[in-house]
Amino acid sequence: MTKFTPLAMTKRLVAFDTTSRGSNLDLIEFATSYLQDLGIDATLIHNAEKTKANLFATIGPTDVPGVVLSGHTDVVPVDGQDWTTAPFDPVRSGSRLFGRGTSDMKSFIATALALAPDMIAADLKMPIHFAFSYDEEVGCLGVHGIISHLSKISPLPRAVIVGEPTDMKVVNAHKGVFAYRTSVLGFEAHSSATHVGVNAVMYAAQLVSYLSELAADQRDYHGKHHRFEPPYTTVHVGTIQGGTALNIIPKECSFVWEYRLIPGENEDAILKKFSNYAEDVVLPKMKEVSEQTAIITERLGRVAPLVPEPDSPAETLAMMLAGTNRAEAVSYGTEGGIFQEAGVPTVVCGPGNILQAHRPNEYIEIAQINACEQFLRRLIEVAATQSV
């Protein structure tokens, strides 16, 4: 079989277009075949439509707690972005490798896969697990199947390392992400008859304005979490759609919004304030004109915050492997908080820089791939000599 370097494996994985709206099965089937050629059985956990799959595999003994190397296989779209190279035809230029997913986050998965032969040869006393998910970029949907699979493993892993891009710094805390869609249902009429219509767009604007007030409250009141940038919970409206024509009072308007929560804060507080304002202030004005009006808010996704666990097995191990005694905090979300909620100590540490994620001409410094390789080689040394 072909032996891959971490760089070569990264190029191979980036060549798969695994944009979240499509399938990741070509990549998963490649990884499964690669592992099978090494004598490693992989468990695939499919979505309901069988169009996507998670991969879970174990190298080493199955009767002692191990370390999970976790990564997502999907990437964000390239539509409308001005790329100077083909996004799924990775190109090396100087010290950088360009392509969608190079930083976020196929390099980590690739390095783990490339080192699988070395893990086998090391005769591990502590297992190393691969957990590669789908649909992280659209709400961490796939990882829940991996969590269900973990619940069947005895004993549970001792630690999870999520390889999102951190410049190989150890991250023990990140914000939670809570996403919603609010739909305002008004009453349609001719634009000259504003007294009989209920303008869904204008009432939606009031709700968006209130979210701006909540965002300002967070910024002004919460400024003590200096590990984060920015050091407070943020509120953001991403998209809004409504109306059909200038001379029609719009019947419908919807907007998608989120808040990114500092770990430890009440995750429902902002939603409750927003819901109370919608029900007690805005909706009564709408119903004065028509009882057919409504305001409906639905949750689109929840990414649990990663809560600091000083001296946890995951933090202790990752710091040793990275050669540091300092842990960082980040404002973006990962699957890490979900693993942590399932009872497994978790940190985030992987190659690449988050500032490159989701951008045109995404790239990773090849030095980062090399640093990840050394990090995982040290993990192999530890796993070959320690069982607890």
Locate predicted features.
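Metal-dependent amide/peptide-bond hydrolase catalytic core
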Residues: M1, A48, R181-V388
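N-terminal helical capping/dimerization or prosegment-like subdomains
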Residues: M1-D79, S95, E252-V256, K273, ...
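A structural signal for short hydrophobic beta-strand segments in well-ordered beta-sheet cores
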Residues: A57, P90-R92, V237, F339
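Active-site metal-coordination/substrate-binding segment of hydrolases
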Residues: G66-H129
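Short beta-strand segments
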Residues: S70-H72, A131-S133, V160-G163, S183-L185, ...
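Acidic-glycine-rich active-site phosphate/pyrophosphate-binding loop
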Residues: V78-S93, P157, N172-V184
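Acidic/histidine-rich catalytic neighborhood of metal-dependent amide-processing enzymes
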Residues: M105-A179, V388
